[in-house]
């Protein structure tokens, strides 16, 4: 079983492909950085609480004292203040981020959420920053990728539908080249060699336009229930994609993934349905 672990480094920012997702390393300086390095941690924390993520990332590289001050407590005032400034009130007030253990983890999840610039024209990302809404457009399948993809490391995220599935509702991964919109109602994820998907409606695994069997591999597998959180586990070391449901490990769905940048992705067909995706970080085996 996999569970999220707090990030060891700074929350990732920007868009594109991430490596192992470990974040910034400890400052290269051998000691304190002048007078600033000798400031008490509580004073540094107060100063850091006014900075933005990119500035905090630079501060973490100054010296080991600053790095420890930033990353010693993931619920410190630094991360709480940044969380309050960066995330929508709805995301913090509701249970969207209930499985994230710290303010820092919540910021990291936001950095890895759906991209507003890398989705079908028929969907939009709601103000909470984590939920996709599909407009009621006839004869169209619409998808979205996250802001950051992965070429290294192990990563976990949760996905759940908050509306009807329709005839096709697919979760999985995609390269940057995979299309995020097409005509008709089809399994967009898995329709070519650039994406891999699990259709929650009929439990089929899809890749390269073909059905790769049913999933999970058991008799009378239960159907997906609206609101049920599915955990997706991408292992770029073993080149596998696996799924969990309710902390039950369902098995490895895809093996032999290519060594390219892969993005969490979904595709939907039902009008006004909504899909939420939350990045959890590195999974722990248990």
UniProtKB/Swiss-Prot annotation:
SMART domains with a match to the protein in the record: FBOX, SPRY
F-box domain span: 33-82
Alphabetical list of InterPro entries matching this protein: B30.2/SPRY, B30.2/SPRY_sf, ConA-like_dom_sf, F-box-like_dom_sf, F-box_dom, FBXO45-Fsn/SPSB_families, SPRY_dom, SPRY_FBXO45
Domain of life of the organism encoding this protein: Eukaryota
UniProt keyword Transmembrane present: no
Factors inducing expression: Down-regulated in response to DNA-damage. Induced upon influenza infection.
The protein's name in its UniProt record: F-box/SPRY domain-containing protein 1
Native source organism of the sequence: Homo sapiens
Name of the gene encoding the protein in the UniProt record: FBXO45
């Amino acid at each position: 079983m996999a569970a999220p672990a707090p990030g060891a480094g700074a929350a990732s920012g920007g868009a594109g492909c991430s490596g192992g997702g470990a974040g910034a390393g400890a400052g290269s300086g051998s000691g304190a950085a002048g007078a600033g390095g000798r400031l008490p941690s509580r004073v540094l924390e107060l100063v850091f609480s006014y900075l933005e993520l990119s500035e905090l990332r630079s501060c973490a590289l100054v010296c080991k004292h600053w790095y420890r001050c930033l990353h010693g407590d993931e619920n410190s005032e630094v991360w709480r203040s940044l969380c309050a400034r960066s995330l929508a009130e709805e995301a913090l007030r509701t249970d969207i981020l209930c499985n994230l253990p710290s303010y820092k983890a919540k910021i990291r999840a936001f950095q890895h959420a759906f991209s507003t610039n890398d989705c079908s024209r028929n969907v939009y990302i709601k103000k909470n920053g984590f939920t996709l809404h599909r407009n009621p457009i006839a004869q169209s399948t619409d998808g979205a990728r996250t802001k950051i993809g992965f070429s290294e490391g192990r990563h976990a995220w949760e996905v759940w539908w908050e509306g009807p599935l329709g005839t096709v509702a697919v979760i999985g991964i995609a390269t940057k080249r995979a299309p995020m919109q097409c005509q008709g109602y089809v399994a967009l994820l898995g329709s070519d060699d650039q994406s891999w998907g699990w259709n929650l409606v009929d439990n089929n695994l899809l890749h390269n336009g073909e059905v790769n069997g049913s999933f999970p591999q058991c008799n009378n597998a239960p159907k997906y229930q609206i609101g049920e959180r599915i955990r997706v586990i991408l292992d770029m070391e073993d080149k596998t994609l696996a799924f969990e449901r309710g902390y039950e490990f369902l098995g490895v769905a895809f093996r032999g993934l290519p060594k390219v940048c892969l993005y969490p992705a979904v595709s939907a067909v039902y009008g006004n349905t909504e899909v939420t995706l939350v990045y959890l970080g590195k999974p722990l085996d248990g």
